[in-house]
C-alpha cells in the first residue's frame, strides 16, 4: 500500500532529523524568530460574498502522477495564487514521493501573510513544531495514518502551540475519529491513500454526518467550478485544489475561473 510506504519513509526521515536537531533546540529557535500564526478558521469560513473558499496547493509531484509541474518555483506560484484571490496555501513538504521541502514554506512566508498549510504525513509532535518554526499556520493530520489516541494527542499539541489542523478523512471510521478528537476543520479526501483511486461521491456521503460548527473541506479530483458549486450546496465550505492548478499555464486565470470572478 502506498500510504504504508510513505509512512515508513517518514519515520526514517524523522529519526534522522531528530538526531540532527533535538526537539528542545528546535523549540528554542522560535525565541529568535517568533511567529504568530494566522487565524485559519476565519480565513476558511464562508461569507455572503464568498460562499466557499479555496486552499490552493503548491505541489511538484505525486506518487500516482509523477512530476506534475516541471517549471516549479514555489514563491512565483504563491504570488500568482494570491493575486488571483486564493484564501490559503497548501504546501507539500514530503520530499520522496511529492518532491516537497520544508524550505518552501519559509520561502513563501517571506512574501505573504496568507495562511499556509503544511501538507505532509505527520505522525509526531516534532513535525508540528517544525511547521510553526518554518512559518506554517495549520498542519494536515491524516486520520487513516493515526490511531484515535495519536490523533487526539497531536491535535492537542497543535492547538497548544497556536496552530490549527485540517484533519483528513476518507470513510466513516476516519470521520468518527476526527469528530471524537475535537477537530475544528475536517477535510474529506476523495482519494484513497492506499491505492490512490478516486471516489468523487464521498463528500456528498459524509457531509451529512459531520456535526454542525465544523469547517468542511473537500480535497482531490476537483477540476471544475460546477463541482465546487454543487458541493458547496451540500455543505462544503472550502476546497483544496492542487493538480488542476499545477497543470495550468495561467494559474491566475484558472483560480479566478474556479472562484467565478
From Swiss-Prot:
Molecular function GO terms recorded: indole-3-glycerol-phosphate synthase activity; phosphoribosylanthranilate isomerase activity
CDD domains: IGPS
GO BP of this protein: L-tryptophan biosynthetic process
Enzyme class: lyase
Organism annotation: Campylobacter hominis (strain ATCC BAA-381 / DSM 21671 / CCUG 45161 / LMG 19568 / NCTC 13146 / CH001A)
Any one Pfam family match given in the protein's UniProt record, by short name: IGPS
UniProt record similarity statement: Belongs to the TrpC family.
Record InterPro entries: Aldolase_TIM (IPR013785), Indole-3-glycerol_P_synth (IPR045186), Indole-3-glycerol_P_synth_dom (IPR013798), Indole-3-GlycerolPSynthase_CS (IPR001468), RibuloseP-bd_barrel (IPR011060)
Gene3D superfamilies hit by this protein: Aldolase class I (3.20.20.70)
Gene symbol of the encoding locus: trpC
UniProt protein name: Indole-3-glycerol phosphate synthase
EC number assigned by the record: 4.1.1.48
